Amino acid sequence: MSLLIDFIDETEEVKDEYISLIRGLVEKAAQMENIEEGAELSVTFVDNERIREINRDYRDKDQPTDVISFAMEEMGEGEMEIVGAEMPRMLGDLIISIPRAKEQAEEYGHSFDRELGFLALHGFLHLLGYDHMTEEDEKEMFGRQKEILEAFGLGR
């Protein structure tokens, strides 16, 4: 199984091991979710100020957050479905705040690797259509997160 993942580091703080961790975890999730070969996504690493701007501009929340997902397959109001040639499946974009991930790892008392992996997986599942707006959806999404993290070796 192989996804095409474009990593963009706006912080200049991201080590190769972080990219390897996220690539491996997202590949494992894609395998467990039966995502086809060649599907694409991007992962951008930003600081708290940048994610606050994105959160404000796209979600009307003027505060930093840990991860934001932009699913390409989610149809917005008034958007037309694109039907065309055999193109790779574009899942969407993940934006992860590195400083927020560090803060939360400390706050929750676990490693930065686990927090970064959790955030990447959480965002990835949103790209696949999972959500936690209702209690039932939350139970399904968080249960799936736990299964994948444990299968990858990042369980609690």
Curated annotation (Swiss-Prot):
<dbReference type="GO" id="GO:0004222">
    <property type="term" value="F:metalloendopeptidase activity"/>
</dbReference>
<keyword id="KW-0540">Nuclease</keyword>
<keyword id="KW-0963">Cytoplasm</keyword>
<dbReference type="GO" id="GO:0006364">
    <property type="term" value="P:rRNA processing"/>
</dbReference>
<dbReference type="InterPro" id="IPR023091">
    <property type="entry name" value="MetalPrtase_cat_dom_sf_prd"/>
</dbReference>
<feature type="binding site">
    <location>
        <position position="126"/>
    </location>
    <ligand>
        <name>Zn(2+)</name>
    </ligand>
</feature>
<dbReference type="GO" id="GO:0005737">
    <property type="term" value="C:cytoplasm"/>
</dbReference>
<feature type="binding site">
    <location>
        <position position="132"/>
    </location>
    <ligand>
        <name>Zn(2+)</name>
    </ligand>
</feature>
<dbReference type="GO" id="GO:0004521">
    <property type="term" value="F:RNA endonuclease activity"/>
</dbReference>
<dbReference type="InterPro" id="IPR020549">
    <property type="entry name" value="YbeY_CS"/>
</dbReference>
<keyword id="KW-0698">rRNA processing</keyword>
<protein>
    <recommendedName>
        <fullName>Endoribonuclease YbeY</fullName>
        <ecNumber>3.1.-.-</ecNumber>
    </recommendedName>
</protein>
<keyword id="KW-0479">Metal-binding</keyword>
<dbReference type="Pfam" id="PF02130">
    <property type="entry name" value="YbeY"/>
</dbReference>
<dbReference type="InterPro" id="IPR002036">
    <property type="entry name" value="YbeY"/>
</dbReference>
<keyword id="KW-0378">Hydrolase</keyword>
<feature type="binding site">
    <location>
        <position position="122"/>
    </location>
    <ligand>
        <name>Zn(2+)</name>
    </ligand>
</feature>
<comment type="function">
    <text>Single strand-specific metallo-endoribonuclease involved in late-stage 70S ribosome quality control and in maturation of the 3' terminus of the 16S rRNA.</text>
</comment>
<dbReference type="GO" id="GO:0008270">
    <property type="term" value="F:zinc ion binding"/>
</dbReference>
<keyword id="KW-0255">Endonuclease</keyword>
<comment type="similarity">
    <text>Belongs to the endoribonuclease YbeY family.</text>
</comment>
<keyword id="KW-0690">Ribosome biogenesis</keyword>
<keyword id="KW-0862">Zinc</keyword>
